């Protein structure tokens, strides 16, 4: 829940004033204002007071809805299941229960509930899409990608830690959002039940030890929310989301930038991207700082939260009119947490594209025919929410965020890396007649990649070579007193690191022995 504050809470600035009546008035008001954490307690209180069966069912559904909005999948499932057993006639209870089960990795059971929902509402594509999502998740978990991930317990806390960016161009410092103790103002959010988020920084030393995170300067952090940082290539300009008062004393979520001045961040400047009453957040800046992609629910979108793009002619120019990223990127669901890779590809999180559950991380590559969107699959993605990926320049290494089980807090930061694919060739050369080991044999490796190297077998008859990906190889073995022998191998079609083994037998050259009268 913490990670989407920038878009959800902004509704506070534009909601009309209304007076509600009845035992759920306070709960309904909290829910409408996005204060879902507060709404849970208020609805439970109202449920205990309610006498009418239908009213109690409605309240149970709203308790489940509130848990859904704070991403508490376990409690959401429990309350949806309760209201379904009571005969509540809203098909969405079945759909959202299936979503909650999928978010907990209960794929087989979730598939059954998606099928039940399709029976209740055959015209809604979300039922079949849920079944497809669960089937894909099961397949992807059975065939994980080569990415390795590690929880950054060095600076994660028991609270929510997310939204990370590099703060130095040598990647030795990071800035991230956190709702930990020590946040400016020390106030608890009615939306999340945690402290309002601030931006923190941490630095790694030469021994790989990370420093204790400390808040950024007070000129950046306020008593309310700051989060989702993005930095330029030189790491001397910071873009971030902030929740601040406008001139009419309304709380509005906007994007700000701050330039570094004498090693300190300067006065933040608001980016003029939308009217005052329109919430914008989650900035992603390109390396040249001429393109900015951000999140908004402004008019002209495709459903929930959409990705929008704005450009400018140079760094001193004003930003142009935002343009929606289009239906290849945006869906009827939510698209958030964009990141512009140095190679021009776009990474973002979505619960609208087919995924494993909750928010999944996607890579979008632009070609002549438009954008091609691919799921990052497992283990980058999980049944939980996975979001906010950043890369260490063009290296296959960086960070992302997740609320998957096994973390330290409600949202954690994870490091990921893609180990290089490594192929080795090894084998033993033996006497084909006696099976004796042959030392000192010449092994010549000739490859389609241009390789042409020779090595001699060790005293144990072994040889070793490093191989290139996607190449064919011939192996020629020679030794005095033996006939030459040949073999072949290939790395074509191999997608994971592997040690190939080719043992070779040399047959004694009996003709040569006969010349010397040896039998």
Stretches with model-predicted labels:
Residues 448-462:
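Short, acidic Ser/Thr/Gly-rich low-complexity loop/linker segments typical of extracellular
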Residues 73, 96, 103-428, 432-434, ...:
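Short, conserved micro-motifs composed of acidic
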Residues 51-54, 88, 122:
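Short coil turns that delineate tetratricopeptide repeat
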Residues 24, 56-62, 91-96, 112, ...:
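Alpha-solenoid helical repeat scaffolds
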């Amino acid at each position: 829940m913490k990670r989407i504050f920038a878009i959800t809470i902004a509704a506070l600035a534009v909601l009309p004033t209304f007076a509600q009546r009845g035992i759920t008035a306070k709960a309904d008001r909290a829910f409408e204002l996005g204060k879902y954490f507060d709404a849970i307690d208020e609805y439970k209180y109202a449920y205990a007071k309610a006498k009418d069966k239908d009213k109690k069912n409605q309240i149970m559904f709203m308790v489940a809805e509130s848990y859904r909005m704070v991403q508490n999948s376990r409690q959401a499932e429990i309350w949806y299941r309760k209201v379904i057993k009571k005969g509540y006639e809203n098909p969405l209870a079945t759909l959202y229960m299936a979503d909650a089960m999928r978010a907990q990795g209960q794929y087989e059971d979730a598939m059954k509930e998606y099928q039940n929902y399709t029976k209740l509402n055959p015209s809604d594509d979300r039922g079949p899409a849920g079944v497809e999502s669960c089937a894909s998740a099961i397949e992807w978990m059975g065939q994980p990608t080569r990415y390795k991930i590690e929880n950054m317990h060095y600076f994660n806390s028991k609270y929510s830690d997310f939204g990370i960016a590099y703060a130095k161009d040598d990647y030795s410092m990071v800035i991230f959002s956190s709702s930990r103790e020590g946040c400016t103002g020390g106030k608890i959010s009615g939306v999340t039940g945690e402290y309002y988020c601030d931006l923190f920084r941490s630095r790694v030393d030469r021994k790989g030890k990370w420093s204790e995170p400390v808040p950024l300067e007070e000129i950046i952090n306020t008593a309310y929310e700051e989060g989702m940082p993005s930095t330029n290539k030189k790491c001397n300009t910071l873009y971030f989301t902030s929740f601040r008062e406008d001139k009419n004393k309304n709380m509005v979520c906007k994007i700000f930038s701050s330039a570094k001045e004498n090693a300190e961040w300067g006065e933040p400047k608001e980016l003029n991207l939308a009217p005052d009453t329109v919430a914008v957040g989650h900035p992603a800046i390109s390396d040249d700082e001429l393109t900015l992609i951000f999140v908004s629910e402004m008019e002209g979108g495709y459903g929930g939260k959409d990705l929008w793009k704005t450009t400018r002619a140079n760094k001193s120019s004003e930003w142009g009119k935002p343009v929606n990223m289009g239906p290849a990127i945006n869906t009827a669901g939510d698209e958030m947490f964009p990141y512009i890779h140095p190679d021009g590809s776009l990474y973002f999180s979505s619960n609208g594209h087919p995924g494993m559950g909750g928010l999944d991380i996607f890579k979008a590559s632009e070609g002549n025919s438009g954008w091609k969107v691919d799921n990052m699959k497992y283990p980058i993605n999980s049944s939980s929410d996975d979001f906010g990926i950043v890369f260490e320049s063009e290296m296959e290494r960086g960070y992302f965020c997740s609320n998957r089980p096994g973390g330290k807090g409600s949202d954690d930061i994870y490091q990921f890396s893609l180990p290089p694919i490594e192929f080795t060739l090894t084998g033993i050369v033996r006497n084909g007649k006696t099976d004796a080991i042959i030392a000192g044999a010449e092994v010549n490796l000739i490859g389609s990649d241009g390789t042409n190297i020779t090595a001699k077998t060790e005293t144990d008859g072994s040889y070793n070579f490093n191989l290139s990906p996607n190449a064919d190889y011939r192996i020629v073995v020679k030794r005095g007193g033996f006939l030459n022998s040949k073999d072949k191998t290939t790395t074509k079609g191999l997608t994971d690191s592997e040690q190939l083994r080719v043992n070779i037998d040399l047959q004694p050259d009996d003709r040569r022995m006969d010349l010397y009268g040896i039998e």
